[in-house]
């Protein structure tokens, strides 16, 4: 963990804060404009304070290396430690260091996406039904270890389908749905 990794991680945590506020918010890189971050870097534990610019809601994230986790909640705490790992692992709070080598969120390649609510999920599932009802079409899959799934995680709302938005010069906005599958241990 270094100061640059933590700076890039703070942008991801801004988006996680937006999901904590509204689990069905449309996520894109413009979400960063709603938040300010304060980073107190330390080799053992780094505190990242994310504050909403309008309502001043504050969330404090404690960031640890995977080798030295000593988590105790603080005021306005997120509720779980954020762990920087050496390789990709299950868990919404575990970010591999290779995710943090570049500023992923501000990149032009960062997608625009949203979690589907139960009504939208039911509509997608009904569209996937074939004529006889015995077979269903399947959506493309994405693993629960992908950064989009880690961002959209909420403990009380299961994530089954993620909708991505892509700009198209001819048709406007295209949508692409992907189903989330779990990774075996």
Swiss-Prot record:
Cellular compartment(s): Virion
GO molecular function: DNA binding; DNA-directed RNA polymerase activity
GO BP annotation list: viral transcription
Protein name as it appears in the record: DNA-directed RNA polymerase 22 kDa subunit
Assembly mode: The DNA-dependent RNA polymerase used for intermediate and late genes expression consists of eight subunits Rpo30/OPG66, Rpo7/OPG90, Rpo22/OPG103, Rpo147/OPG105, Rpo18/OPG119, Rpo19/OPG131, Rpo132/OPG151 and Rpo35/OPG156. The same holoenzyme, with the addition of the transcription-specificity factor OPG109, is used for early gene expression.
Keyword terms, alphabetized: DNA-directed RNA polymerase, Nucleotidyltransferase, Transcription, Transferase, Virion
Origin superkingdom: Viruses
Biological role stated in the UniProt entry: Part of the DNA-dependent RNA polymerase which catalyzes the transcription of viral DNA into RNA using the four ribonucleoside triphosphates as substrates. Responsible for the transcription of early, intermediate and late genes. DNA-dependent RNA polymerase associates with the early transcription factor (ETF), itself composed of OPG118 and OPG133, thereby allowing the early genes transcription. Late transcription, and probably also intermediate transcription, require newly synthesized RNA polymerase.
One Pfam family linked to the record: Pox_RNA_Pol_22
InterPro entries: RNA_Pol_22kDa_poxvir (IPR007937)
Gene: OPG103
GO CC annotations, alphabetized: DNA-directed RNA polymerase complex; virion component
Family classification: Belongs to the poxviridae DNA-directed RNA polymerase 22 kDa subunit family.
Organism: Variola virus (isolate Human/India/Ind3/1967) (VARV)
The reaction(s) this protein catalyses: RNA(n) + a ribonucleoside 5'-triphosphate = RNA(n+1) + diphosphate
